[in-house]
């Protein structure tokens, strides 16, 4: 079957359906990894940072592909199955995947959450509120993909999974009766077109500070990538925007092009705030209430209060009543790896995902606010093969707000672990702190946690930061199974604590 084939509509080249609907083609599934291709699959060749799917067309054919989707100019005359040339295979992958699953998002209320920090927490708070209102929900976050209480596997560790997985998850959620789905929308996922097959009813913007600049190149490109979520809001949908966040006006401008109803929020919306180690109590004026009402949350910190306000405004936009909102916030279960308290005696041990300068500063400031007398001992590192500016930022943050620091492996990947720790350490010493007195470098994460417990006194706080919920550490030799929470519990048990 060689020759030129008219590009079917589902590749995204044509505005209207024409000859071939992928749902009625003999395709078994859509694949972008040639190793996963089986008989009857369509293989979409993607050019990535480290490999090019066009180099594996032969493998895809050998494994049973019935058609190939390639970038323009990449058609192979020696391959005998249909090949479709497109302008951008990543864009086409998203559209093919949505078509293959029969556009599951069309039957769902899709809610997208973007921002540098707070995406997962905001998603979990909103999900708790929706469930309290009796809705069947799905959620796709950094932490997990979940339908009700059923957790789906995400072996990639990508927050925004590739479009075939996203569309497959949406189809499964729709088939299991979900009405609302919350999706974390990362800058990389948006820029890489993974969410192109989704039309959102509501978008949330939490905040924005520099991050992922190794991928985006500069802050302008990073902001533009984040704002792509609001381009995907349905005409006349809803946009929830943190008006106090830098760059918020850009997101509002994009939302206006979709004629979205914009709801703004900021910390000033919460009054009579009382914060303690066990949670936060504040008052809030709902749109349908004349007098402010008291809300109880088991989360602490101004950043979590902002996340809560985002979820409240989103709930109001979705028509959820204030009683369900209050109860959903109050009944929110522990979010894995987000200010997760492992132990309170004789010292407090907390695991948190904070891995940016702003995130670390926020959590340490919060811990100081609820217990200014306690020493803050921090176990932290930085990821390899990622934005190296993070290392300087992490060093600045802990130098300013911690009392003692153990620098350790996070995900070194192909980099020398000690080199990463040296770069963080250089930032700390530049701030006037001395190695040995203020910080130590212990690459092995278990040993670093053990050392933190050795130096901790009664009443201190040990913060194990950077990995949170994650279940592996990535090294050059490959990933190893890991859990900060489990490791902390095991070491505490060794100490007979």
Name what the model sees in each region.
Residues 12, 74-80, 176, 200-349, ...:
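Acidic, Mg2+-coordinating active-site environments of NTP-dependent enzymes
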Residues 8, 91-243, 249-257, 309, ...:
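Phosphate-binding loop of NTP-binding sites
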Residues 70-73, 185, 207, 243, ...:
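Short secondary-structure boundary segments
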Residues 77, 147-154, 211-216, 386, ...:
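A short acidic, helix-capping loop that chelates divalent metal ions and anchors anionic groups
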Residues 1-18, 37-42, 48, 52, ...:
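ATP-dependent carboxylate-amine ligase
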Residues 1-95, 99, 238-239, 246, ...:
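N-terminal leader/targeting and accessory segments in enzymes
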Residues 20-30, 93-96, 161-164, 183-189, ...:
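Short gly/ser/thr-rich secondary-structure transition/capping motifs
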Residues 66, 201, 403:
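Receiver (REC) domain switch/active-site residues of two-component response regulators
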């Amino acid at each position: 079957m060689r020759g030129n084939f008219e590009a079917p509509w589902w590749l995204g080249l044509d505005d209207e359906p024409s000859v071939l609907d992928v749902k009625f083609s003999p395709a078994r599934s859509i694949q972008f990894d040639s190793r996963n291709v089986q008989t009857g699959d369509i293989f979409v060749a993607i050019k990535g940072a480290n490999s090019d799917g066009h180099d594996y067309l032969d493998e895809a054919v050998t494994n049973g592909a019935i058609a190939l989707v390639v970038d323009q100019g990449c058609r192979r005359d020696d391959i005998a199955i249909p090949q479709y040339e497109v302008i951008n295979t990543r864009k086409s992958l998203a559209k093919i995947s949505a078509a293959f699953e029969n556009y599951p998002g069309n039957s769902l209320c899709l809610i997208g959450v973007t921002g540098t920090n707070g995406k997962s927490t905001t998603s979990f708070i909103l999900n708790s509120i929706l469930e309290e209102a009796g809705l069947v929900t799905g959620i796709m976050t950094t932490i997990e993909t979940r339908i009700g209480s059923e957790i789906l596997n995400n072996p990639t560790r990508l927050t925004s999974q590739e479009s075939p997985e996203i569309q497959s998850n949406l189809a499964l959620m729709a088939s299991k009766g979900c009405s609302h789905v919350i999706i974390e929308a990362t800058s990389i996922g948006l820029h890489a077109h993974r969410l192109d097959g989704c039309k959102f009813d509501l978008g949330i913007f939490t905040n924005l500070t520099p991050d992922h600049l190794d991928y985006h190149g500069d802050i302008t490109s990073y902001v533009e990538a984040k704002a792509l979520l609001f381009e995907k809001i349905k005409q006349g949908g809803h946009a929830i925007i943190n008006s106090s966040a830098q760059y918020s006006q850009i997101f509002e401008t994009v939302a206006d092009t979709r004629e979205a109803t914009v709801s703004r929020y900021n910390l000033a919306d919460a009054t009579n705030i009382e914060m303690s180690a066990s949670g936060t109590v504040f008052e809030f004026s709902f749109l349908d209430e004349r007098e402010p009402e008291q809300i109880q949350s088991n989360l602490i910190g101004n950043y979590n209060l902002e996340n809560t306000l985002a979820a409240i405004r989103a709930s109001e936009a979705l028509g959820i009543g204030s009683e369900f909102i209050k109860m959903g916030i109050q009944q929110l279960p522990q979010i894995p790896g987000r200010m997760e308290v492992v132990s309170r005696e004789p010292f407090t041990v907390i695991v948190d995902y904070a891995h940016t300068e702003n995130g670390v500063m926020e959590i340490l400031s919060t811990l100081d606010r609820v217990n200014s007398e306690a020493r803050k001992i921090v176990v932290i590192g930085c990821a390899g093969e990622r934005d190296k500016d993070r290392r300087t930022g992490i060093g600045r943050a802990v130098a300013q707000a911690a009392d003692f620091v153990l620098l350790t492996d996070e995900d070194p990947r192909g980099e020398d672990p000690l080199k990463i720790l040296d770069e963080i350490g250089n930032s700390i010493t530049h701030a006037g702190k001395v190695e040995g007195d203020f910080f130590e470098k212990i690459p092995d994460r278990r040993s670093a946690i053990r050392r933190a417990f050795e130096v901790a006194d009664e009443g201190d706080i040990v913060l194990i930061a950077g990995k949170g919920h994650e279940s592996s550490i990535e090294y050059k030799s490959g990933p190893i199974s890991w859990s900060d929470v489990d490791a902390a519990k095991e070491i505490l048990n060794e100490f007979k604590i």
